[in-house]
UniProtKB/Swiss-Prot annotation:
Catalyzes the reversible conversion of 2-phosphoglycerate (2-PG) into phosphoenolpyruvate (PEP). It is essential for the degradation of carbohydrates via glycolysis. HAMAP family: Enolase. Keywords: Cytoplasm, Glycolysis, Lyase, Magnesium, Metal-binding, Secreted. GO terms for cellular component: cell surface; extracellular region; phosphopyruvate hydratase complex. InterPro entries: Enolase, Enolase-like_C_sf, Enolase-like_N, Enolase_C, Enolase_N. GO terms for molecular function: magnesium ion binding; phosphopyruvate hydratase activity. This is Enolase 2. It comes from Cupriavidus metallidurans (strain ATCC 43123 / DSM 2839 / NBRC 102507 / CH34) (Ralstonia metallidurans). PANTHER family: ENOLASE. It comes from the Bacteria. GO terms for biological process: glycolytic process. Binds a second Mg(2+) ion via substrate during catalysis. The active site is at 205 (proton donor), 337 (proton acceptor).
Length: 425
């Protein structure tokens, strides 16, 4: 039993140049674990609260010294001498110490940093990689990447209303081949955009941000890029979209500023159905707003049997919200973001609940990422089968793909690729 001997917090930078929390945990046997917490741009109203300083004299008010102080004082004092191998106890102590339902007193960014760093330290103490420590013998399923190659919405400075357009290499035989195919499509897409006179600068998540005005423009060029790269659209590589509909929802309607169109609930559902009919789309995330329960139910009735419908803002990685959504007939999958809930134990419980209802669980990054690769290990440990971690550029994104490549190599003949599971839907 290795015990927590030291906990240190530090204010560092994320991929957007904003401050975030890094935590280092040292155990009494010398094992060390480190984690850096990401941050989102498009956030759900029911997410756990990240603690910011609100001091305009530092980082335009976005500093995290208060969260770092919570790590170095209250959280450290409460956890010193505790068994690092008892993750549920570690997380329960922190949750009780915070004492708020959304972790606003100490900050979800403080709690999550400690939670993940403890897990890393315990894994090192046991001489195991994190995925094997957390998942045991069943940790052998490599996820299908949902690769965001065209950015819009809150993630880019263009007129596209939808936030993400993704390629999904579900037809690849291995994760390694999935990465290769995706990189080839990414570079083919870059050349096509450049030839057509569009900018090839990239957005927060490493995807391109061309000055398109409608989703169809992005989907058309993606289908063409897949084919030009030598792959079969819908067979080798499919598509996924994230409308981030909560960002479009104004007074009960969906306002598309780029298109200059306003859609009712029924029109929004009909539009998504038309896109799914026309393009090889296998997954739609946040197709309806988090506050539009009737819209979610309608969309699920219309598309749920033939398309993965992922709830992000509507569920916020919370098991209670997920159970409520299942009972109401909303979605058939959940996006899993550790900082939406604030501790590793709660995130694991959410994935357990999802799998219990036969809902898919998609492990996800945030738009403000770091070099931390924990979510790659978590995707394998929890047998999520899918991961969203950005495009084929920017080191904060490719670091996660590189970690998964190493995990696949380490697993050897035990490695499975989850492509068939997604294609079977």
């Amino acid at each position: 039993m290795s015990k927590v001997a030291e906990i240190r917090g530090l204010e560092v930078l994320d991929s957007r140049g904003n401050p975030t929390v890094e935590v280092e945990v040292v155990l009494d046997d010398g094992a060390v674990g480190r984690a850096i917490v990401p941050s989102g741009a498009s956030t759900g109203a029911r997410e756990a609260v990240e603690l910011r300083d609100a001091d305009p004299r530092r980082y335009l008010g976005r500093g995290v010294l208060r969260a770092v102080q919570a790590v170095n004082t209250e959280l450290c004092e409460a956890l010193l001498g505790r068994d690092a191998g008892d993750q549920p106890e570690i997380d329960t102590i922190m949750i009780d110490l915070d004492g708020t339902p959304d972790k606003r007193r100490l900050g979800a960014n403080a709690l999550l940093g400690v939670s993940l760093a403890v897990a890393h330290a315990a894994a090192m103490s046991n001489g195991l990689p994190l995925f094997a420590y957390l998942g045991g013998e069943r940790a052998s399923l490599l996820p299908v990447p949902l690769i965001n190659v065209i950015n819009g919405g809150a993630h880019a400075d263009n007129a596209l209303d939808f936030q993400e357009f993704m390629i999904v290499p579900a037809g690849a035989p291995t994760f390694t081949e999935a990465v290769r195919a995706s990189a080839e499509v990414f570079h083919t897409l870059r050349a096509m955009l450049k030839a057509a006179g569009y900018t090839t600068n990239v957005g927060d998540e490493g995807g391109f941000a061309p000055e398109f005005h409608a989703a169809e423009e992005a989907l058309d060029i993606l289908v063409a890029a897949i084919a030009k790269a030598g792959y079969r659209p819908g067979e080798d590589i499919a598509l996924a979209i994230d409308p981030a509909a909560s960002e479009l929802y104004v007074n009960g309607s969906y306002v598309y500023q780029g298109e200059g169109v306003e859609r009712s609930r029924e029109e929004q559902v009909a539009y998504l159905v038309r896109l799914a009919d026309r393009y090889p789309i296998v997954s739609i995330e946040d197709g309806m707003a988090e506050d539009d329960a009737m819209g979610w139910q309608l969309l699920t009735r219309q598309l749920g049997k033939r398309c993965q419908l992922v709830g992000d803002d509507v569920f916020c990685t919370h098991p209670t919200l997920l159970r409520q959504g299942v009972e109401q007939g909303m979605a058939n999958a959940i996006l899993v973001k550790a900082n939406q809930i604030g501790t590793l134990s709660e995130m694991r419980e959410t994935v357990r609940v999802a799998h219990g209802y036969a809902y898919s669980a998609v492990m996800s990054h945030r738009s403000g990422e770091t070099e931390d690769v924990t979510i790659a290990d978590l995707a394998v440990a929890l047998r999520c089968g899918q991961i969203k971690t950005g495009s084929m550029s920017r080191a904060d994104r490719t670091a996660k793909y590189n970690r998964l490549l190493r995990i696949e190599r380490e697993l050897g003949s035990r490695a499975e690729y989850a492509g068939a599971l997604l294609r079977r839907r």
